[in-house]
Structures are given as C-alpha cells and as structure tokens.
Amino acid sequence: ILGKFCDEIKRIV
C-alpha cells in the first residue's frame, strides 16, 4: 500500500 507515494518521495529525496 502507498507504493506510489513511497516511490515519489524516494525520487524527491
């Protein structure tokens, strides 16, 4: 769950 969110956050970091 919240996989897309984690991917976006990881990309920003």
Swiss-Prot record:
Which family is this sequence assigned to? Belongs to the non-disulfide-bridged peptide (NDBP) superfamily. Short antimicrobial peptide (group 4) family.
Q: Where in the cell is it found?
A: Secreted; Target cell membrane
Organism from which the protein derives: Heterometrus petersii
Keyword Membrane in the entry? The reply is yes
Function, as annotated:
Amphipathic peptide with antimicrobial activity.
Q: What is this protein called?
A: Peptide Hp1478
GO terms for cellular component = extracellular region; membrane; other organism cell membrane
According to UniProt, the tissues expressing it are described as: Expressed by the venom gland.
Keywords on this record? Antimicrobial, Membrane, Secreted, Target cell membrane, Target membrane
Q: What more does the entry say?
A: Negative results: does not show antiviral activity.
